[in-house]
Regions:
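Nucleotide/pyrophosphate-binding catalytic subdomain
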Residues: 1-182
């Protein structure tokens, strides 16, 4: 890879603090057991708002940025609503997006099925998305910015005896992120 390719930035965003919980509460307006397809369609919107706002903020600073949904980058998942697993990321599509020189701001936490249905990955899904995209692009590194001070075997805010890791491979990180680690 040349120097420009090695310094390319891809941003994966999560919803703003509290937004996913707010959307979950909205989903209960018509009962405690909403349709799973519609539930995922609703709660995936928080990341779309974050991606668009971040792209607007970067553009206002003179940087070229564009927001993309998981569907637009062809991030394919299983059809398990709210607990989908990433099956494939279209590397050619990602490289096409990167080729225009913009900073891609991609929605985390979600994907699409082979039939185009929106699915969500469950809590921690944006971290999973970031690691999966980094792996698909053979990135040198994947930085996760969060409210936790390192990589833990599970969410330390939920499990007090979670263990902090000194180092981890990309494959190991992908596995842990898929299980909700922080």
């Amino acid at each position: 890879k040349n120097e420009a390719e090695m310094n390319t930035v891809v941003v994966v965003v999560s919803a703003m603090a509290g937004e996913t919980d707010r959307l979950i509460e909205l989903s209960k307006l018509f009962g405690d057991n909403p349709n799973k397809r519609e539930f995922d369609a609703l709660i995936s919107t928080g990341e779309k708002v974050s991606a668009s706002l971040l792209a607007m903020a970067l553009n206002s600073l003179g940087l070229k940025a564009k927001s993309y949904s998981a569907a637009q980058v062809s991030l394919k998942t299983t059809s398990n609503f709210s607990k989908a697993k990433i099956l494939d990321i279209d590397k050619a599509k990602m490289e096409e997006i990167l080729s225009d020189g913009s900073i891609p701001i991609i929605t985390g936490f979600q994907g699409i099925t082979e039939t185009g249905e929106v699915t969500t990955l469950g809590r921690g899904g944006s971290d999973t998305t970031a690691v999966a995209i980094a792996a698909s692009l053979e990135a040198n590194r994947c930085d996760i910015y969060t409210d936790v001070d390192g990589i833990y075997t599970t969410d330390p805010r939920v499990v007090p005896n979670a263990k902090k890791l000194d180092a981890i491979s990309m494959e190991g990180m992908l596995e842990l992120a898929g299980q909700g680690a922080k």
